[in-house]
Amino acid sequence: MNHDSRTYPFKFSIITAVYNVASYLSGAVESILCQDIGFKESVELILVDDGSTDSSGEICDHYQALYPYNIKVLHKPNGGAASARNAGIALASGKYLNFLDGDDKLSPNTLSAVYNFFSTVDDQISLVSVPIQFFEKKENAHRLNYKYRDGKDQIIDLNVQYSYVQMSIASSFIKHNVLNDHSFDTSLRYAEDAKVIMQLLLDHPYYGIVPSGCYYYRFRNTQNSALNGTKLHREWYLDCLKNYLQWALHSARQKYGKIPFFVQYNVMYDLQSRFGVPEIPESVLTTAEHLEFRTLLKELLQSIDDKIILEQKNLSREQKDYIISFK
């Protein structure tokens, strides 16, 4: 990988897209202030207020007044998480970037653990991830945390460990100089973060894992676990499939002449939840759109080997058989 010889004033820039999270934002910020790597010496926090209508913007300004050297605040009209993150990247001056959500937290040792690992393998990878732990309404570990079960910092070779999916940008730490060549797709309401990560991994199918760090993902008490809000939006069924999953398969085929297993596994992991929706309301998809959705599913599945479907870790044998027959 290209060596980055530039000097950065901060080890990390934490970029947070802020939208109506007044009840939680202080917790997110405080989790950065208390990082044992040393906030004042090592960390820049960029708070992008994306047109909040509650007091989130004022909370951003409050913290900037307390730490004017370390905290930058940008107030902008609402444009979505992708546009807010892109705006934050333009302001960043840290060597490594992270995209903490405004209602989540990092464990106090996360930045030091990630930095220490990067310092030993900096020329080999551009991305490091940490485990995700849910809190508030749910308190279990993320289903992809099996990647960290060995408990060791290590480099993942996706050519071999193709089931070690990484989709969350919030639990990722990425080299600034590498991310400069990419941006978040503002046409996507969902999976804009996964698309950026896929771009990076298509270029270089290796990344690091640091099991001792932790990203705390707030599963809010107001969320309905039976029918997640994403399943009530047209974009999750159509735009995400066309502008992320189809794009991923096409890009992989163009680059490699085939679709590597790690791309197939990633796409199938993302697709599987679409088969768990009992009935899509007409208020979400029209009859024509529902037909388009089913056609897209079939087209995507044509590019996925049965082997990859059968190796999914969160589907029953009956579900796997159904998906294979659906092809």
Regions found by a protein language model. Give the residues of each.
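Catalytic core of nucleotide-sugar-dependent glycosyltransferases
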Residues: Y216-N221, L227-Y256, I280, L285-D306
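Terminal low-complexity segments of carbohydrate-biosynthetic enzymes
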Residues: Y256-P260, V267-K327
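Hydrophobic/aromatic-lined pockets within catalytic cores
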Residues: S119, P205, L249, R253, ...
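Nucleotide-sugar donor-binding/catalytic module of glycosyltransferases
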Residues: M1-W247
